[in-house]
Amino acid sequence: MAQVTGKTLYEKVWDSHIVASPEGEAPVVYVDRHLVHEVTSPQAFSGLKVAGRKLRAPQKTFATMDHNTSTRSASLDALSPMARTQVETLAQNCKEFGVRLYDIHHPNQGIVHVMGPELGITLPGTVIVCGDSHTATHGAFGALAFGIGTSEVEHVLATQTLRQLKAKNMKVEVRGKVTDGVTAKDIVLAIIGKLGMDGGTGYVVEFCGEAIEALTMEGRMTLCNMAIEMGAKAGMVAPDETTFNYLKGREFAPKDAMWEQAVAAWSELKSDADAVFDVEVVLDANDIAPQLTWGTNPGQVVAIDGVVPNPETETNSTNRTSMIKALEYIGLTPGTKMTDISINKVFIGSCTNSRIEDLRSAAVHAKNRKVAEGVVAIVVPGSGQVKLQAEEEGLDKIFIEAGFEWRLPGCSMCLAMNDDRLDAGDRCASTSNRNFEGRQGRGSRTHLVSPAMAAAAAVAGHFVDIRKPY
């Protein structure tokens, strides 16, 4: 008889959601929460109308407007014709199909991966999907969360299920404690730098270790948000007291006796001691410094006290070619100190780093300082709740007095899809998740950093090591 081993966190959630496993076919997986937005949902709703179908579970579908909305005005008149069509179509579809919508006038409107968790829509042990690649964010709660395509969006709307092949298991353990100035963003960039853009392809990654357990829920969301950037299907962190304390009392979280039952069940959501992972990776938290990307993918990253790498020292020919191409686009010379790189734009926001703790850490470096001459810096809260809390704490005043622009919630400059974008030649310190060619605008050059690093760069006019006086 084959020896039975324990299960990983991923396997526990996966196994509990299998509806059917037809021989020779991909298993059918039940979906607990479906998040939709204005960009990837119109064709899906159209498909339902053509087929004469209704939503299988409208109460498990939640919609918001975020990708194409303006961060300057809540008026529809501020939108481009295409963006206006998209948000109006979403509103019409939600009304017709009975979907709860957080539109641009709703106080809880925001980036889908920010407002979902803060409303308690995201819960441990659930399967969550969205037509957006950074759905992995919700894995911070011990949920299995991943992005899907528009045709799959339609399938979930109609059936509340998906056909999915099971992924392999990877464990990434970060041992020890991080030093001052090192954040969740730095941890995940260091992980991606170690594994590369495709190091997680075919895997669901469980993040664990002392450094991960010490993170707040907002830090864990930053971590899981970027699991996709190393090719992983999803990222997960086992729920614990930090998770439960964050969720308690939130609008869609269980209440009263149901809460106690839920916590008891959630407490079992952790990998068994004898669980087997296909790959295990270990990092020492003490070795991680504030990180900064130098190239055109998140894996092209070094510590702030490092230099732009030389492609000639790379033994892998494919990597060497990629490095040369990246340096040509980004306009940097090998050997350049990272602290000598000047910037003219700063973006603090996105589903990676637009939560209240992110804004607090950025405000520390903005307080009683001024944005450097020639630098344009914007701060975009991730949701209406984040914006309100930041304003109650006076963070908006700190940013405005320092010369930052304080905006309305939205995806903003993370992607060149709305009216917040970079011009050709701009060099931006960005707290977003992707630094691909043209991601923030045609010909733009993006460097991924933490909110603290971005704010410090804004006032210095160049990248600085925030662990030292500047």
Curated annotation (Swiss-Prot):
Disulfide bond residue pairs: none
Matching InterPro entries: 3-IsopropMal_deHydase_lsu, Acnase/IPM_dHydase_lsu_aba_1/3, Acoase/IPM_deHydtase_lsu_aba, Aconitase_4Fe-4S_BS, Aconitase_4Fe-4S_dom, IPM_dehydratase_rel_enz, IPMI_cat
EC number(s) reported in the record: 4.2.1.33
One annotated GO molecular function: metal ion binding
Annotated [4Fe-4S] cluster binding sites: C351, C411, C414
Cofactor annotation: [4Fe-4S] cluster
Pathway the protein acts in: Amino-acid biosynthesis; L-leucine biosynthesis; L-leucine from 3-methyl-2-oxobutanoate: step 2/4
Record's catalysed reaction(s): (2R,3S)-3-isopropylmalate = (2S)-2-isopropylmalate
EC class name: lyase
Gene Ontology process terms (BP): L-leucine biosynthetic process
Cofactor remark: Binds 1 [4Fe-4S] cluster per subunit.
Keyword terms: 4Fe-4S, Amino-acid biosynthesis, Branched-chain amino acid biosynthesis, Iron, Iron-sulfur, Leucine biosynthesis, Lyase, Metal-binding
Function: Catalyzes the isomerization between 2-isopropylmalate and 3-isopropylmalate, via the formation of 2-isopropylmaleate.
Complex and partners: Heterodimer of LeuC and LeuD.
Family, as annotated: Belongs to the aconitase/IPM isomerase family. LeuC type 1 subfamily.
PANTHER family: 3-ISOPROPYLMALATE DEHYDRATASE, HOMOACONITASE, MITOCHONDRIAL-RELATED
Name the UniProt record assigns to this protein: 3-isopropylmalate dehydratase large subunit
Organism per entry: Shewanella frigidimarina (strain NCIMB 400)
